[in-house]
Amino acid sequence: YTTLFRSCCNADEGDPGAFMDRSVLEGDPHAVLEAMTIAGYAIGASQGYIYVRAEYPIAVQRLKIAIDQAREMELLGDDIFGSGFSFNIDLRLGAGAFVCGEETALMVSIEGNRGEPRPRPPFPAQKGLFGKPTILNNVETWANIPQIILNGPEWFSSMGTEKSKGTK
């Protein structure tokens, strides 16, 4: 595995009154870490980033604890379970700008710059975070992945409506 690809989680929901990200991160941060690690393995990424609102101090605290626990259990870090696969996740606190909910602005902010959208193309999957191909999903999408793997896609699509399967 190389450091060619990046995996990223947008936990910077900016819509007024939206608390889905906060609820998931406060309740089950390990689901997001697990999914990002699985995706990292699938695409050959060795680094993930979670961009979370600084205004969610409990979510930030629980993410830090979950990351430390995952490292202690060797679920994150170098040579996970002697597999040769290494994957780390770092937190980045959002700067409070609504525009950083846009994926390219979010990546610019993670890189330490002012969060302003980049023109596309190139798209993040081609040239994203730190110039590397990047996959970026929101908290809800990441949190669903372990359950879909565990229960199967039929289980997931049994929720929702005929025209909108799943949790949305």
Place the predicted regions along the sequence by residue.
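Hydrophobic alpha-helical positions that pack around
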Residues: V60-K168
